[in-house]
Amino acid sequence: MKAAVWHAQRDMRLEDIPEPEVGPEDVKIKVVYAGICHTDVFEYLYGPQTVFNPPLALGHEFSGVVEEVGEAVTGLKKGDPVTGLPYYPCWECTYCQQDLWNLCPSAQAHGMHIHGAFAEYVPLHYRGVYKLPEGVSLEEAATIEPTSVVYRAVKRSGLKKGESVHIVGAGPVGLLLANVAKYKGAGKIVVSEPLDSRREKALEMGATHVLNPEVEDPITRTHEICDGVGAHVSFDCVGTAATLDTAVYSTRRNGRIGILGFGFYESPTYPLMLLAAFASEYTYFATLGYNVEMKEVVDLVGKGELHPGDVISNIIPFDQIIDFFDHFEENRRKYLKILLKIG
């Protein structure tokens, strides 16, 4: 099968590799669309960071159709439109027994340990394959993976109906977060973002207020908008010292601060504001992937409650992937979610 295989920094090759074998509990999926995550681009430019077994096909956001099922698999058949978990948990450890599959120490992740979705076929365990509801397109289904990350983050935040939210950064993750926060019944949803086009998109996705941090102080303005005391929950969707600072100090006392962004283009490490945490009794939390949340998101998209497909800005042919990655740095602020058309 054809795959985009990462070998080293700025060295990705379209190659023929063996198709995945199908075990008794496996499902072989013909990939139709694969989403490009910023982690894929960072790996291409600066890896190895998360790739443990190069050369390896990257990609963990995808949709497709069932090509083949193992002998123990029921409920799925060839031709079914699906998406699924891009990793193999062990299903047996203490974390898996609590449905915390994303924390399984021996999980084998697509695009990290085994070939990912930048390929014509990808294998999944049947327990992590979700058939798409009628009316959900394969294009939109390819955005369910990042939406599941965001959905879990909002769940972990304990967001209550009517509470205020501040989202720092309106890339795909921040935009999806606005959409999920709206669905969850948040009151004021404030989004800080310097790009005009992304602020406009944030309003379409559920934001009630948008701020340009290059023109106005997002900390002061968020306090003013949110009862004079700040947001109940803030999310840093960028991952730099400056954006974390904004998220922290725009949050009211006894509030919660979620960390979803990695500052790949600056420093991937930054100080946690411990003094602020003590002084204001903040709760910090981070989110690693998702588990049962993906099934919930599939159902919500099917019901029209969430609209993750609205973040798609470009669809490019699979054979243009290397050229796209080569020029991503100079153009990255122009894009939202990019899909590869593979099948």
At which residue positions do the language-model features occur?
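Short Gly/Pro-enriched turn/cap motifs at secondary-structure boundaries
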Residues: H7, P18-E19, N53-H60, H110-I114, ...
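C-terminal hydrophobic helical "lid"/dimerization subdomain
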Residues: D245-Y249, N291-G343
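Mid-domain Rossmann-like dinucleotide-binding core that forms the NAD(H)/NADP(H) cofactor-binding site
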Residues: V136-E216, T220
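Glycine-rich cofactor phosphate-binding loops and adjacent beta1-alpha1 units
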Residues: S157, L203-T283
